[in-house]
Design a protein with these regions (language model features):
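Hydrophobic ligand-binding cavity/cleft-lining segments
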Residues: 1-40, 45
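Short secondary-structure boundary/capping segments
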Residues: 1, 38, 59-60, 87-89
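Glycine-rich portal/gate segments that line the openings of hydrophobic small-molecule binding cavities
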Residues: 30, 35-78, 135
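Generic structural detector for well-ordered beta-strands
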Residues: 8-12, 58, 86
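Intrinsic-disorder/low-complexity, polar/charged segments enriched in Ser/Thr/Lys/Arg/Asp/Glu/Gln
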Residues: 2-8, 45, 54, 67, ...
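Hydrophobic pocket/interface hotspot
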Residues: 18-22, 28, 46, 59, ...
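Beta-strand/loop substructures that line and gate deep hydrophobic ligand-binding cavities in soluble
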Residues: 75-123, 130, 134
């Protein structure tokens, strides 16, 4: 499996204020419903269509105020993957966040989409940090 790690971003809040949102897919509904097709979510699962692929995700592990592990849950995504949302509280008003992706990619897929996956992780974590810092 290939590992992709986002840049670390700073959120000016304690981890206890961030964790409830990143550990519950239903809280993402307002932000994502108009960006993907057929968005459906419960606390621990979600599914949607993105660029012709049906994506299903399931939260498989939660460690309060530390991390959330998400894995693929059915769908038509042509790879096995897992990703983590990691939180590290440095002080009461300073939590660092990063995303880690493990994906099973053959050599050709790695060459075709590896840089896009890395860029996507970096953009996603920047967006998460910006959103939490605006609240």
């Amino acid at each position: 499996m290939q590992e992709y790690i986002s840049k670390q971003q700073q959120i000016f809040r304690p981890a206890s204020q961030i964790y409830p949102f990143v550990s519950n897919f239903s809280f993402l509904s307002p932000a994502l419903a108009d960006k993907v097709e057929d968005w459906q979510a419960t606390e621990d699962t979600c599914s949607f269509k993105f660029k012709g692929f049906t994506v299903g995700l399931r939260i498989v592990e939660k460690v309060e105020n530390k991390h959330v592990k998400v894995m693929g849950d059915g769908g038509t995504v042509p790879m096995d993957f897992a990703f983590w949302i990691q939180l590290h509280q440095v002080s009461e008003g300073d939590t660092r966040i990063r995303l880690v992706l493990h994906a099973e990619l053959n050599m050709m897929m790695r060459m075709m989409i590896g840089k896009k996956l890395q860029s996507g992780l970096d953009q996603a974590v920047e967006g998460l940090a910006a959103a939490f810092n605006r609240i």
